[in-house]
Amino acid sequence: MSTSDHDRLLIIDFGSQVTQLIARRLRELNVYCEIHPFNLVDDAFLDAFGAKAVIFSGGPSSVFADGAPMPPASVFERGVPILGICYGQQVMMHCLGGKVERGHGTAEFGRAYVTPTAQKLDMLQGWFETDQDREQVWMSHGDHVSQIAPGFEVFGTSPNAPFAITADTTRHFYAVQFHPEVHHTPNGARLYENFVRLAGFKGDWTMGAYREEAIAKIREQVGSGRVICALSGGVDSSVAAVLIHEAIGDQLTCVYVDHGLMRKDESAQVVGMFREHYNLPLIHADESDLFLGKLEGVSDPETKRKIIGGLFIEVFEKYAKEIGGADFLAQGTLYPDVIESVSFSGGPSVTIKSHHNVGGLPERMNMQLVEPLRELFKDEVRALGHELGLPASFIGRHPFPGPGLAIRCPGEITREKLDILREADAVYIDQIRKHGLYDEIWQAFVAILPVRTVGVMGDGRTYDFACALRAVTSVDGMTADYYPFTHEFLGETATRIINEVPGINRVTYDITSKPPGTIEWE
């Protein structure tokens, strides 16, 4: 089965930072969906895509702005269900004859509560069933709908959004002012479940199906060509490598680049596992002197990422020539990598940081990219890894960034700081495993801070580095909360690091959520 054989849901992106979460909620329901920016969706695109239903995302724009993001008018004439979210609701009302007003004292940002009207709606099955007869939602809007379009009725209200939930049940158009995709709308998943049920989706998107489709796509793209795979030992690149090897066998050669930025003993573990257990063709390229030399004296995080991305390509091109010339470069790029790096014209999703798999790559490349995981979220990659037979202990490893410890070492990178960081990180992860917490945490690591602090050890004065412990819980990496360690755990861990790691005399714990922070420090 190819992706064209699935029921297809189109998400038209108007620039929301959380559009990918809409896709994630739909994937959890085994629905195949794609996200496309509004400015690339026209009548010809709609004809070719063949959507069974459409969702309008939120976005930062106002329908009053010059050149405001809008869908093609014909989308409302195709006889398919449409769900508008936040700005998507305002667009729907604006296009269909309703009215939107600027937010003067009616803006809502954050938690709000929606109460039902007397009318019943299939779309709200499972909502408003508690004793309080209201639902917590997450609002983020300035403008608001002041008059609904002809054919629509009101099914839910909030203090500052009298048309919080509206629907035209004849045409199966639904519109909500809040964001059901975020975790701050606890019952939001039920709305998506109801929407795809009413639209008649079969729910046939699974990782078993994706595996077969991806293998077919890889074979079609690569043909008889050779592929060189960037193997880091992380879950993403490892699943990509095993998937590609299953598709094309020894046309694949993996290159493990030791850039001097890996965790303690990681290089030996990765090389041993893939050579001995998976029997993958693997080149171990120790290029640590090259990378650390180019990074010497560099403090800016974006510059670090771009240097690392550029050097990766140089190294891969060099080893591709040594193995007889590879036509393709494989990477474990994921959906969140792309959404945090791409800003499309006219629907300004703000670029947060470049990723070494995406924005850090130079324009000049002598190989085509193979990115079989580009459409997947992290938990889908893990499910795919299970389908491919990778060990559960390996699939459950925490994410590790391509630039490695470079972005956990704010400021200038030195070999001394990297050695200290490796030891501190090893102690921290050992503590987490010892307390049985590893699988409860999405990602945990140590960052070594670019400051030295005064301390006292025994009768002597110390002047050593401070470090920050980081641990977060998340579903997909798009949003995250800090993990609530006990004070006893933090005290025990800090004591171990200070006693066992020369060069550290102060330990802090980072309790910043995402947003406003990012998971990594750089």
UniProtKB/Swiss-Prot annotation:
Q: What class of enzyme is it?
A: ligase
For this protein, the parts annotated as crossing the membrane are: none
Q: Which CDD domains match?
A: GATase1_GMP_Synthase (cd01742), GMP_synthase_C (cd01997)
Classification via PROSITE patterns: GATASE_TYPE_1 (PS51273), GMPS_ATP_PPASE (PS51553)
So, what pathway does this thing act in?
A: Purine metabolism; GMP biosynthesis; GMP from XMP (L-Gln route): step 1/1
Which InterPro entries is this protein grouped with? Class_I_gatase-like (IPR029062), GATASE (IPR017926), GMP_synth_C (IPR001674), GMP_synth_GATase (IPR004739), GMP_synthase (IPR022955), GMPS_ATP_PPase_dom (IPR025777), Rossmann-like_a/b/a_fold (IPR014729)
SUPFAM superfamilies attached here? Adenine nucleotide alpha hydrolases-like, Class I glutamine amidotransferase-like, GMP synthetase C-terminal dimerisation domain
Provide the catalytic activity annotation: XMP + L-glutamine + ATP + H2O = GMP + L-glutamate + AMP + diphosphate + 2 H(+)
Q: Quote the EC number.
A: 6.3.5.2
Source superkingdom: Bacteria
Q: What is this protein called?
A: GMP synthase [glutamine-hydrolyzing]
Biological source species:
Roseobacter denitrificans (strain ATCC 33942 / OCh 114)
